[in-house]
């Protein structure tokens, strides 16, 4: 494990990385938010279905 070699690789990646523009950040935030809402809706539907099945039994 060569620490200086790993640190140089990390610094190289950080030098190449750039901050996203506002439009790019906004698009990523919208997509991530939609994904979170979709997963939450699926979980809520499963909760409702399982609650209905348990109440019938």
UniProtKB/Swiss-Prot annotation:
Membrane-spanning ranges: 34-54
GO (cellular component) term, any one: plasma membrane
Xref: InterPro entries: Prot_translocase_SecE_dom_sf, Translocase_Sec61-g, Translocase_SecE/Sec61-g
Family recorded in the similarity comment: Belongs to the SecE/SEC61-gamma family.
NCBIfam families linked: PRK09400.1-6, secE_euk_arch
HAMAP family: SecE
Role: Essential subunit of the Sec protein translocation channel SecYEG. Clamps together the 2 halves of SecY. May contact the channel plug during translocation.
Protein known as: Protein translocase subunit SecE
Organism: Halobacterium salinarum (strain ATCC 700922 / JCM 11081 / NRC-1)
The encoding gene: secE
